[in-house]
Amino acid sequence: MLGGAGEEGFGLALRWAMAGHQVIVGSRSPDRAVEAARTIAQTAGRPVRVSGLSNENAVLQTDVIVLTVPFTALLDTLKTVKPSFKPGQVLVNVSVPLETAIGGRATRTVGVWAGSAGELAASVVPKTVSVVTAFNNVSAELLRDPSKPVDCDVLVCSNDENAKRIVLDLVKSIAGARGFDAGALENSRTVEQITALLVSLNIRYKVKNAGLRITGISHVS
């Protein structure tokens, strides 16, 4: 979990730890990662498998890496950990190019030369690493409250079908969440735009956890 000490990363790490997964919280500061792991264990309220390491060491010790850093830190983070990647790993990009990256509004996104943050991530990591876009539209506020189910849907995009299946299984392990195969990685462009819309809805309706629900599909991945 790169950026696991931040709000979104903390929330996802908490939910997966509570679901029985072994979770490694990564941070530029190992001490901050250890502290976040300790807080996750306390918040879970029951024994969980969670630890904290530097980002580089976290990548070395896991098969699925989840990137939750702000968009402004995406490139630097991936370039720093690039030597630690191993063939066959899956990178899940949660970062969204909101306009706040350049001092603008959180209700808008900025253009990305690669097309989307997910595609940008794919252009940086080794070709032997499969990149997946997922969890971009899930409220950190909701994830961080273990007393509530995550009653929203997760759109999963990737050019690697096996990597999508791995991430869809991770979605299933979060109480209340449903995963949908949203096609190729280029569809990240649409998925990331939805995040800005949800932020706008949060502001308009004075809430913090607006989410997405897909209807009309009886079979969920």
Can you say where each PLM-predicted feature lies in the sequence?
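NAD(P)+-binding Rossmann beta1-loop-alpha1 motif at the extreme N-terminus of oxidoreductases
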Residues: 1-42, 173
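Active-site-lining helix/loop region of Rossmann-like oxidoreductase modules
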Residues: 2, 152-221
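A short helix-to-beta-strand connector/capping loop
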Residues: 43-51, 127-130, 177
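Rossmann-like NAD(P)-binding element
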Residues: 44-90, 96-104
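General beta-strand structural signal in soluble alpha/beta enzymes
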Residues: 52, 92-93, 130-134, 179-182
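Glycine-rich beta-alpha junction loops
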Residues: 73, 95-98, 138-139, 160, ...
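Short beta-strand and adjoining strand-loop segment in the mid-core
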Residues: 104-114, 145-162
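Rossmann-fold dehydrogenase core element
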Residues: 110-136
